[in-house]
């Protein structure tokens, strides 16, 4: 009982801190004799290279470039830029290493706690650097609002994921306004992993979740009519079965699945097809996060899964992004910042991203 009391106390404390943080930030904005001049962060970015890369669009069930050619992304997630900068590892060299791994896209996870603590103004500076480096190296970008939980109930898996509907709307207003027209930023992943955690995070129906996403998309489109919103399903962004009867009412979007190996037992393929793969016949689908099993990240434990999932995704025309290019976050892809020795998880991605030996 004591453990649960501590857990709920932490949630209440973090929620109060979140609300207090919003109030403090609001007060800081008006601590000026010319308070009427204060504006919200995220004014449109001015980047002469914004159109350097081809604009990615949705055409039927595919992502295509400006020539109409189908694009299948092989992406790689980095850790949160705030974490990396605090550790002294935020640099152009990091993105060069990601490029060398074979990635054509970088997924950037923005945690709500980091967004608040650094402040949106300062966090945008990190994102601007990332977009600049990715443009130079010809890698596209997903900006991911990296929360896990029930956005409707306001209950989340861990304190770092605590956010609110208001903050989520404000985040996407800020991001869409700032990166509108920048072709490198191809995708906005609206919410990382919606989950009810077997009822421990309250209740939310698909219809309620669909409506939240539709409202976010409308807000994004008020500022940015080109970048592609990505919508996740329940079960930690794995399950897309509601698309069978009630897809999101929006054009030019994609859907997300996170098909980690623990989600289903063998035989995998028919279960993947039933749970999310079927959707790729009608809509663009992007497996934006998965990797080797947590705590068992060896080829011996994951080799068969790895080759099977990549083969399945690519035959289905589903773009994918591996998790995570970091030596601390699991499943890690290299051992340390000192020597960058790849783990089996890292070696596998590099081989897969380069198309496997023929």
Pin down the residues of each PLM region.
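Sec-dependent N-terminal signal peptides
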Residues: 4-13
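N-terminal carbohydrate-binding accessory modules
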Residues: 21-105, 234, 278, 351-355
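Extracellular glycoside hydrolase catalytic/binding regions
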Residues: 55, 87, 160, 166-187, ...
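Acidic/histidine-rich helix-loop elements
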Residues: 71-94, 115-119, 156-160, 262-265, ...
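NAD(P)H-binding glycine-rich loop region in Rossmannoid oxidoreductase-like domains
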Residues: 108
């Amino acid at each position: 009982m004591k453990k649960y009391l501590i857990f709920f106390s932490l949630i209440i404390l973090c929620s109060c801190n979140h609300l207090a943080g919003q109030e403090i930030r609001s007060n800081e904005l008006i601590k000026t004799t010319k308070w009427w001049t204060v504006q919200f962060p995220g004014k449109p970015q001015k980047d002469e290279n914004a159109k350097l890369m081809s604009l990615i669009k949705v055409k039927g069930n595919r992502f295509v470039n400006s020539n109409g050619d189908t694009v299948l992304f092989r992406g790689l997630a980095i850790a949160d830029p705030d974490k990396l900068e605090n550790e002294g590892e935020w640099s152009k060299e990091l993105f060069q290493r990601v490029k060398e791994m074979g990635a054509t896209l970088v997924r950037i996870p923005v945690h709500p706690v980091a967004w608040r603590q650094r402040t949106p103004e300062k966090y945008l500076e990190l994102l601007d650097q990332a977009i600049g480096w990715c443009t130079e190296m010809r890698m596209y970008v997903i900006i991911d609002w990296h929360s896990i939980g029930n956005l409707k109930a306001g209950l989340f898996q861990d304190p770092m994921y605590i956010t609110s509907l208001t903050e989520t709307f404000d985040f996407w207003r800020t991001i869409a306004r700032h990166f509108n027209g920048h072709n490198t930023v191809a995708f906005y992943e609206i919410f990382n992993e919606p989950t009810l955690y077997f009822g421990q995070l309250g209740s939310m129906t698909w219809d309620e979740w669909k409506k939240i996403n539709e409202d976010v998309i409308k807000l994004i489109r008020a500022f940015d009519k080109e970048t592609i919103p990505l919508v996740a399903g329940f079960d930690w962004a794995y399950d897309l079965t509601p698309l069978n009867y009630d897809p999101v009412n929006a054009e030019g979007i994609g859907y997300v699945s996170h098909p980690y190996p623990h989600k289903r037992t063998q035989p995998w393929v028919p279960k993947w097809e039933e749970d999310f793969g079927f959707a790729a016949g009608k809509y663009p689908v992007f497996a934006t996060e998965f990797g080797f099993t947590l705590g068992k990240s060896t080829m011996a434990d994951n080799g068969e899964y790895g080759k099977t999932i990549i083969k399945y995704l690519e035959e289905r025309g589903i773009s994918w992004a591996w998790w995570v290019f970091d030596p601390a976050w699991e499943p890690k892809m290299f051992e340390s910042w000192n020597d960058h020795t790849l783990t089996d998880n890292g070696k596998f991605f590099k081989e897969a991203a380069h198309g496997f030996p023929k």
